[in-house]
């Protein structure tokens, strides 16, 4: 049976100059921060090849990450920690991280496109865009910044805790990851409200 393809209407850009895109990476992992990015692109300095970060190779991601940092007008990152995720839940922690990414920009955008189906509370108008990382260039750029940032942090965590395979699975739940936490337990960076982690901690 073929997969039903949904055609989304074209995204209409508002009549503003400073338009930002925001996306998140890391809602599903068992460990580490949820990381968000906010990007304002330069219309006079276009970047080709922007796409949903999940569909790009590691090499292409790294190249685009550098190009976005070089060519975009403004780039900022936000995050919410495992402690905040456990206290707020992953949805509210993600909204908080998105707010922080916008707040961390060195200039206030006039309008913000948010990936997904809801907007965080912001001081400027915003619009949520389903599948925005494939439909809005600013969101695509933000998804690349967020993903490369988080992936590199997981590679650093892998050096600290080499038995968990963080560099490979980036903290997401995999068979190898489950086996590692069953054998070695959890580190302080784990999200203790997530069911597989609760199970290891004997909280279920």
UniProtKB/Swiss-Prot annotation:
Location in the cell: Cytoplasm
Annotated Gene Ontology cellular component terms: cytoplasm; ribonuclease H2 complex
Taxonomic lineage: Bacteria, Pseudomonadati, Pseudomonadota, Gammaproteobacteria, Alteromonadales
RNase H type-2 domain ranges (all copies): 17-204
Record-given protein name: Ribonuclease HII
Main location: cytoplasm
Entry keyword set: Cytoplasm, Endonuclease, Hydrolase, Manganese, Metal-binding, Nuclease
PANTHER family, A to Z: RIBONUCLEASE H2 SUBUNIT A, RIBONUCLEASE HII
Enzyme class: hydrolase
Keyword Manganese: yes
